């Protein structure tokens, strides 16, 4: 059986659902295909959903700053009815501890241009603002079994604080909100089905074939399949001209009780998200009683690259839990390290430079929103608009490879050069971590 539509979006995570919404808003007929049973059931469900602006590229900072304005007015962004439960943005701030390989100036030079407010704290102010935090400098990160792990601090740390940062409380609900908004604009979703073939004719995509045999005829196909994006690219026969590689990477985020009084730093407010590349971890509030603890890929840690993202266990391991939570306890001396791991694991779709690819491909009509590298949840509201600008421009005849398109942001008015996310780019400036 053959069905016809304008666009097929493969993947209904927070990125794919945003793309579906914006393309449907533009008047196109959109069908979304996803292997799971609902929006945000893949990598999105394991996201820490941190909203921060500390990217080493100007395009990254502009995208995150614009996206903040979408999260702050989430119901308006979605045009959601009054009774619909929505994910909520928690403005608790983000505090980035000093580290030599990513100095404050790497970010503040962009903040000054874009208009992102920030504060630079010395060690004394950091201690006064966050008294539960050990301000010692311990760089470089070490395995927790290393004899030097508990060595005395070599100096004291300051920090870069962005008061407008924070996190979204329910990343999966955010994806479902976007999917529901897309459906209100006419998009349809096919759950629990996979693409088995990308159909093409004369150098142009003409649709996809689903596992039950249905063919979806479409002039545009968007790959937003997360860690499964490489498999879909291979089905489409694209990727030969990419200058950045992509690989699935399994990651864990752990759940622990917060130290007593940790959140008592601002009345009813929570403590900020703490990004600690000095020890190789980050710490995010989870309500007022708990914390989420993740890693920042320090060089001393082996990374769990996967050939097949389906091979990644969704359960946290004792070894990673012990490593990450012990590092967090070094920074927060009041934190206890439980014996039993608790948390989630997911698979990132990681590029060589930890920067996403939002681009066309050598197959006309086949577009990619991939390589999100664990740091693009925050930008999801904008990515749908970036991809709509890209698709409308290229399908209208613009040669994006020769002259990159520009997207003008609705809220901030900032122009974003889409060439920054090109598949053919030179490797972007990067910390070499999930921070981008």
Q: Where on the chain are the PLM-derived regions?
A:
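C-terminal lid/capping helical subdomain adjacent to the catalytic/cofactor pocket in oxidative enzymes
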Residues: 120, 362-436
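Beta1/beta-strand and adjacent pyrophosphate-binding region of the FAD-binding site
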Residues: 2-15, 31
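Dinucleotide-binding Rossmann-like beta1-alpha1 core, especially the glycine-rich loop
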Residues: 48-146, 280-282
């Amino acid at each position: 059986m053959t069905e016809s539509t304008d666009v097929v979006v493969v993947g209904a995570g927070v990125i794919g659902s945003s793309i579906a919404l914006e393309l449907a808003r533009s008047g196109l007929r959109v069908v979304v295909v996803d292997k799971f049973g609902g929006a945000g059931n893949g990598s999105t469900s394991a996201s820490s959903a941190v909203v921060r602006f500390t990217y080493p590229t100007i395009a990254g900072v502009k995208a995150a700053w614009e996206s903040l304005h979408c999260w702050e007015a989430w119901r308006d962004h979605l045009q959601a009815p009054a009774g619909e439960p929505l994910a909520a943005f928690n403005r608790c701030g983000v505090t980035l501890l000093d580290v030599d390989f990513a100095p404050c100036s790497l970010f503040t030079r962009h903040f000054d241009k874009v208009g992102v407010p920030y504060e630079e704290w010395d060690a004394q102010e950091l201690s006064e603002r966050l008294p539960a935090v050990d301000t010692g400098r311990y760089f470089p990160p070490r395995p927790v079994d290393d004899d030097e792990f508990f060595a005395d601090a070599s100096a004291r740390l300051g920090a870069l604080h962005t008061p407008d940062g924070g996190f979204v409380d329910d990343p999966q609900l955010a994806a479902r909100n976007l999917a529901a908004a897309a459906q209100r604009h006419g998009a349809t979703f096919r759950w629990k089905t996979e693409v088995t073939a990308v159909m093409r004719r004369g150098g142009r995509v003409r649709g996809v074939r689903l596992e039950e045999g249905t063919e979806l005829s479409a002039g545009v196909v968007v790959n937003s399949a997360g860690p499964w994006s490489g498999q879909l690219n291979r089905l489409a026969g694209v990727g030969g001209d990419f200058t950045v590689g992509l690989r699935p990477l399994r990651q864990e985020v752990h759940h622990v009780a917060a130290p007593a009084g940790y959140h008592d730093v601002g009345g009813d407010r929570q403590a900020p998200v703490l990004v600690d590349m000095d020890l190789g971890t980050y710490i995010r509030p989870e309500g007022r009683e708990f914390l989420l603890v993740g890693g920042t890929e320090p060089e001393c840690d082996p990374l769990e690259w996967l050939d097949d993202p389906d091979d990644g266990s969704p359960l946290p391991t004792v070894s990673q839990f012990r490593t990450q939570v012990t590092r967090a306890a070094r920074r927060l001396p009041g934190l206890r390290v439980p014996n039993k791991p608790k948390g989630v694991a997911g698979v990132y779709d990681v590029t060589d430079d930890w920067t996403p690819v939002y681009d066309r491909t050598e197959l006309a009509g086949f577009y990619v929103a991939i390589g999100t590298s664990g740091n693009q949840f925050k930008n999801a509201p904008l990515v749908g608009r970036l991809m709509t600008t890209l698709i409308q421009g290229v399908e209208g005849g613009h040669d994006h490879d020769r002259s990159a398109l520009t997207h003008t942001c609705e809220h901030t008015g900032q122009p974003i050069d889409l060439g920054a996310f090109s598949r053919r780019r030179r490797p972007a400036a990067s910390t070499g971590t999930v921070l981008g």
